[in-house]
């Protein structure tokens, strides 16, 4: 049995992508979610799930969980529930305290409170170099294995010349704390790109992305698609010649599809991933973003698409190998057969 800590099943395709990968890599295991809310905890106790989870293995599925107070409390409870079971964290992200959003939960030296918890783990690897640096600051040396979503199947889809994907959504907060300005500037960029002959498709990673995406794409002929799952999202991103994205996993799945990315860096985790695939040129921080800068980056990405695809593709290949090796170790540790 695997006790799983993540954020899947709540409408975010990025978190669902990670869960899909972990389930595939650990196929044969029975998964039980670590409860998030009081009513879920009561249900786990009343139905005996807590009892059955005793001695199970705990897996942090990925996402930017480490360094956040909310997830530390969930992890505390999960470790207490499993008792002597093994713990594994593959490709996790670490909240950078340099950014203080409305719900970050990383203030008051929160990350140091994670050291004794993560020290108990059999395996810890992280999404990107900044996550590794943050853990090194609290005395934990870890390897960068990449984001688990990079282990989804790679698509075999030809990109459509001139098709630009746009994803406009984010979690609790962003650099600059001004989402309306972001909508305005991206909208200006979209209109300019259309005037230059490009076609636009809006790609939703969460239903909450719809309102801002519709407003940014207002006034132009554009489709908006909401993929039903992560694999479908990869396919939509693969059809594009380039994508302008804010959601972290829109950028990660685009990298998997080898589609050039312009990443609207709304939080440090976007830079963490971009550094991991040697693609910092893709980043525009949301507190300094302008329509002109977006258009310029799109033009540059299209002009240098072959180089970008080779560079990012090589990094993705390396991380797919590292992630597969990490999960093979987890499978061996918990007694699952080789796949």
Describe every region a protein language model picked out.
Residues 1-339:
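Active-site anion-handling motifs in enzyme catalytic cores
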């Amino acid at each position: 049995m695997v006790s799983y800590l993540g954020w899947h099943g709540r409408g975010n395709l990025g978190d669902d992508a990670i869960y899909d990968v972990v389930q595939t890599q650990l196929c044969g295991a029975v998964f039980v979610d670590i409860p998030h809310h009081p009513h879920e905890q009561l249900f786990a106790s009343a139905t005996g799930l807590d009892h059955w989870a005793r001695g199970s293995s705990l897996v942090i599925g990925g996402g930017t969980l480490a360094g956040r107070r909310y997830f530390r409390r969930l992890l505390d409870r999960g470790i207490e529930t499993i008792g002597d079971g093994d713990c594994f964290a593959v490709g996790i992200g670490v909240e950078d305290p340099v950014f203080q959003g409305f719900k970050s939960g990383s203030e008051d030296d929160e990350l140091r409170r994670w050291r004794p918890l993560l020290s108990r783990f059999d395996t810890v690897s992280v999404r990107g170099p900044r996550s590794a640096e943050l853990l090194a600051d609290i005395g934990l040396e870890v390897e960068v294995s990449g984001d688990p979503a990079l282990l989804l199947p790679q698509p075999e889809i030809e990109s459509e010349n001139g098709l630009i994907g746009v994803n406009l959504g984010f979690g609790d907060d962003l650099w600059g704390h001004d989402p309306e300005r972001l909508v305005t500037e991206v909208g200006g960029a979209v209109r300019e790109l259309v005037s230059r002959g490009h076609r636009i498709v809006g790609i939703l990673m969460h239903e909450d992305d719809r309102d801002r995406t519709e407003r940014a794409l207002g006034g132009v002929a554009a489709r908006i698609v909401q993929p039903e799952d992560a694999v479908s999202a990869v396919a939509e991103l693969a059809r594009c010649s380039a994508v302008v994205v804010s959601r972290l996993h829109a950028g990660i799945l685009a990298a998997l599809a080898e589609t050039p990315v312009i990443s609207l860096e709304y939080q440090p985790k976007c830079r963490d991933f971009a550094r991991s695939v040697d693609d910092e040129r893709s980043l525009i921080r949301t507190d300094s973003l302008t329509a002109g800068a977006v258009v310029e980056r799109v033009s540059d990405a299209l002009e240098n698409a072959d180089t970008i695809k080779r560079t990012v593709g090589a990094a993705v290949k390396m991380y797919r190998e590292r992630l597969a090796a990490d999960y093979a170790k987890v499978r061996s540790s918990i007694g699952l057969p080789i796949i």
